[in-house]
A protein has these predicted regions:
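Acidic, Ser/Pro/Thr-rich low-complexity regulatory regions
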Residues: 1-146
Length: 146
């Protein structure tokens, strides 16, 4: 694939992220989806935001598959995207249980990309802690306002 074709794929992925329903799904996923248990995950999977959950995870799993299969170079993809790391960090700790319930291929391409990325698992762990700190700070700020 030419560099121009790769660039066009990257831009297409960006354009798809801007679609209205996808934007709402991403907003929900990063703002409100905080699964600590498999019950939390199942509540989302079968609740009002089922479509949002599936849309975000399958979007980034599909994008990862494009990288894993060589349609987009990993270096270019990771230079242009970081959101996939956050998505994986949000489900990583529950992944064995999720796969037991929903099948072994759940987010498999996303995991493969994370594992192929230098320090990929370290990045997800660091990001998970950073997000936890941000949420704690926001909760304190909300409590002070009340």
């Amino acid at each position: 694939m030419s560099k121009q074709e790769e660039a066009e794929l990257i831009l297409k992925l960006y354009e798809l992220r801007r679609e209205e329903t996808m934007r709402k799904a991403r907003d929900w996923f990063f703002r409100d989806f905080k699964p600590q248990t498999m019950a939390d995950f199942n509540n989302a999977m079968f609740g009002d935001h089922s479509g949002h959950l599936r849309m975000v995870i399958t979007y980034w799993d599909m994008a990862a598959a494009l990288v894993n299969d060589g349609a987009i170079r990993a270096e270019l993809f990771t230079d242009c995207n970081g959101e996939h790391v956050s998505v994986f960090a949000n489900i990583e700790l529950l992944l064995p249980e999720i796969r037991a319930a929903y099948g072994p291929q759940f987010a498999a391409s996303l995991e493969k990309l994370i594992d192929a990325t230098p320090d990929g698992r370290k990045r997800t762990a660091t990001l998970r802690e950073r997000i936890k700190g941000i949420r704690e700070t926001l909760a304190k700020q909300q409590a002070q306002k009340a």
